[in-house]
Design a protein with these regions (language model features):
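ABC family nucleotide-binding domain
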Residues: 13-236
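C-terminal boundary and immediately downstream tail of ABC-type ATPase nucleotide-binding domains
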Residues: 3, 233, 237-258
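Pre-NBD coupling/linker segments of ABC/ABC-like ATPases
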Residues: 1-12
């Protein structure tokens, strides 16, 4: 019998979705981001870790210009992130962000929170917006809560709604800014499960998180930041088992001990 060749699939991240070149940002005299260089390929899952105040959240907020920067260059799908309104509109249509705090409108039902932007910003018909919203509420296992209001949901449920709202844009890139840090410990798993599912679907994701178990399991690359700089980056296996810098070794000792 002829022996069949076994082909092992490998991920191809050659198509660049995010390109960051020599990025610098100051808050007054405080140099918060120092010469950051980072590329993110299509379908790549990048986890950004580091101590509080290291510039992690500021970095990803610069990607869709929620934060302005003073020096350097950022491109999203080849389009420069700058003050040009047309560029910014196109970039933000391709990039969705999930925040630490859910930022749901308390006076709107869950379904209305999800249909508001598609209808009023992007001009989608109500039925289309509603159908899309229900699809993604089902995707995050919370469709039965569609008619409730945010204060009737747990923190974990609200964060899943926030993820569904982000998905309603059909974004090419998803940014997560510490999406579990405001949750009670028992609610963290349900949000991470949704994020793991998105990763398996091939979404391009940049995640700021302290959840090192998620980084080990899902990330293609883990980046360690400290004092506004990228100190080290590597695949998860090397990052956790063979850290090169003393600063990363200390960070891992402290965070993995808890």
């Amino acid at each position: 019998m002829e022996k069949k060749e076994i082909i092992t699939a490998t991920k191809d991240f050659s198509e660049q979705m995010v390109e960051i070149d020599t990025l610098n940002k100051w808050y007054g005299d405080f140099h918060v981001l120092k010469d950051i260089n980072l590329n993110v390929g299509k379908g790549e899952i990048v986890v950004v870790a580091g101590p509080s105040g290291s510039g992690k959240s500021t970095l990803i907020r610069c990607i869709n210009r929620l934060e302005e920067y003073q020096e350097g260059l950022i491109k999203v799908k080849g389009i420069e992130v700058n003050a040009d309104v047309k560029n910014l509109r196109e970039i933000r249509s391709n990039v969705a962000m999930v925040f630490q705090h859910f930022n749901l409108f308390p006076h709107l039902s869950i379904i209305d929170n999800l249909t508001l932007a598609p209808m009023w910003v992007y001009g989608k018909p109500k039925k289309e917006a509603t159908d899309t919203a229900m699809h993604y509420l089902e995707r995050v296992n919370i469709a039965e809560q569609a008619d409730k209001f945010p204060n009737q949901l747990s923190g974990g449920q609200q964060q899943r709604v926030a993820i569904a709202r982000a998905l309603c844009k059909s974004p090419d890139i998803m940014l997560f800014d510490e999406p579990t840090s405001a949750l009670d410990p028992e609610m963290i798993g349900e949000v991470l499960d949704v994020m793991i599912g998105l990763a398996k679907e091939g979404k391009t994701m940049v995640c700021v998180t302290h959840e090192m178990g998620f980084a080990r399991k899902v990330a293609d690359r883990v980046i360690f930041m400290d004092e506004g700089q990228i100190v080290e980056e590597n695949d998860p296996e090397t990052f956790f088992k063979n850290p090169e810098s003393d600063r990363l070794k200390l960070f891992l000792e402290q965070i993995l001990a808890h």
